[in-house]
From Swiss-Prot:
Gene Ontology terms: biological process: proteolysis
E.C. code: 3.4.11.1, 3.4.11.10
Protein name: Probable cytosol aminopeptidase
Entry GO CC: cytoplasm
Length: 496
């Protein structure tokens, strides 16, 4: 969908549908809506009176204009109470609107939602983001085309004579971010027989070449030379060879230390010898959602040309129960030199991240942030509406949580007290890779903390948020691309 702006009279603009915001509190006190009602000879007022139009958030009503306006339809989108409008609610409005447009078979539409009473001027970007993200679908493997007609164009209409340069800049930046989110969603949606470690490496090389990002891919031999046994041990059960992907975007000054982003890249997780149950195992193609988020974030940062230095590290491997697979009871010497007793081969994410976090130290980072679908315990504790965050630096965690509130990719902090470390002690190695049934999200993060050295570090557990089971206004069912917008917003905040 191409989203643009134009300074034109909405009452004279021909289109298949005109999107109009409708607040819940006294909707017809909005002069724009009142003007449209007048042109429709009181049709809206009548429906408000009968409570068929309420302005309830995300509720959509379609009215045919019957030639009274050049727009064939008025699509009224509920904004809720004007005092409760937030950026995320506006994204929801955009997502609800695009679903209604597609359902009505509209291909070309216009919008004045951003001009509704009580809506801030910059809302055009939030609404557009909801439209773009809500329009996503993954259907490349379907052999028969669907019946839904895509929305190809949406024009945001401003008052005639308005300087639209600022809005155009906002929409251009928004399009770059949404493209990166769609890229991440596509990666996570790919089946495990396609999205292998090599596939991730090839995708990284492709977009890096296009955007001028340095990309290095370490193969198994190089990983062995560097002692990355945390990653290599996990990969031993699969015929798919592991890869370690290094992305380097240098948009800041040479003396500015980089932010290192680390993404878990288990392209399929069977659990290994500690095999997962059959039910739901097909979803384990999403165990590389952290890697997808990091790749998408680096793509967006480069596309936006942010004046920051960012390193993306992606350890990529499959976790399968082959003849050479690592086993419970094995002891693995990680890249850091620390030894780990394997008590659960399904706790593989922390093993590959241990090497990546240690590798990150060579960049002398300003901060290290890892994203991972690390623990089912996080889904149990927090559900699917929020990701868990832990770290060793309160200011870093606070900035990430602020970015989460701004983007709707919210975070909830869990503690990392020393007592949790007792659970991870091993009788035969420096530590063990799983701590039993209690506090699983926290003990996993505590394990990771052992490999970050003195770096400022935060861990984001996206196990509950990487996949949407039912679908929400701007998050269709399936891969969410969570983390891309969060990381971009955080990085933008570091240069404000």
């Amino acid at each position: 969908m191409v989203i643009s702006v134009e300074a034109a009279d909405y009452t004279a603009f021909p289109c298949a549908a005109l999107l109009v915001g409708c607040r819940e509190d006294n909707p017809l006190e909005d002069s724009l809506l009142a003007r449209i009602d007048q042109l429709l000879q009181g049709a809206i007022a009548s429906l408000v009176q009968s409570r068929e139009i309420t302005g309830e958030l995300n509720r959509v009503t379609i009215l045919h204009t019957l030639g009274r306006l050049p727009a064939e339809r008025i699509v009224l989108v509920g904004l809720g109470n004007s005092g409760a409008l937030t950026s995320d609610r506006l994204r929801q409005v955009g997502g609800s609107a695009v679903k209604a447009l597609k359902g009505a078979g509209v291909t070309r539409a216009a919008s004045v939602v951003h001009r509704a009473a009580g809506v801030p001027p910059t809302s055009v970007a939030d609404i557009a983001q909801g439209l773009s993200l809500g329009d996503y679908s993954f259907d490349i493997y379907k052999t028969k085309p669907g019946t839904t007609v895509p929305v190809t164009e949406l024009v945001n209409l401003f008052e005639p004579g308005t300087d639209t340069a600022d809005a155009e800049r906002l929409l251009a930046a928004d399009a770059t971010i949404c493209e990166a989110v769609s890229f991440a969603r596509d990666l996570v949606s790919q089946p495990g027989n396609v999205a292998t470690p090599l596939f991730l490496a090839e995708k990284a090389l492709e977009f890096s070449a296009r955007l001028g990002i340095a990309c290095t891919v370490l193969d198994r031999d190089e990983m062995e030379r560097q002692g990355m046994e945390g990653i290599l041990s996990v990969a031993k059960g699969s015929h798919q060879l592991p890869r370690f992907i290094v992305l380097e975007y240098r948009g800041g000054s040479a003396d500015k230390r980089p932010t290192v982003l680390v993404g878990k890249g288990i392209t399929f997780d069977s659990g290994g010898i500690s095999l997962k149950p059959r039910e739901g195992m097909e979803r384990m193609k999403d165990d590389m959602a952290g890697a997808a988020a990091v790749m998408g974030a680096v793509m967006a940062v480069a596309g936006l040309r942010l004046p920051v230095n960012v390193i993306g590290l992606i350890p990529a491997a499959e976790n399968l129960p082959g003849g050479g697979a690592y086993k419970p009871g094995d002891i693995v010497r990680t890249m850091s030199g620390q030894t780990v007793e394997i008590v659960n081969t399904d706790a593989e994410g922390r093993m590959i991240l241990s090497d990546a976090l240690f590798y990150a130290q060579r960049f002398k980072p300003a901060a290290v942030i890892d994203l991972a679908t690390l623990t089912g315990a996080c889904l149990v504790a927090l559900g699917s509406a929020v990701s868990g965050v832990m770290g060793n630096d309160a200011a870093l965690v606070k900035l990430l949580r602020r970015a989460g509130e701004a983007t709707g990719e919210r975070l909830w902090e869990l503690p990392l007290w020393d007592e949790y470390g007792e659970i991870m002690k091993s009788d035969v190695a420096d530590l063990k890779n799983a701590g039993g049934p209690h506090a699983g999200t926290i003990t996993a993060a505590w394990f990771l903390q052992r490999f970050v050295g003195k770096s400022r570090w935060a861990h984001v557990d996206i196990a509950g948020t990487a996949w949407e089971e039912k679908g929400r206004p701007y998050q269709p069912k399936g891969a969410t691309g969570v983390g891309v917008r969060l990381l971009v917003e955080y990085l933008k905040a570091t240069v404000r």
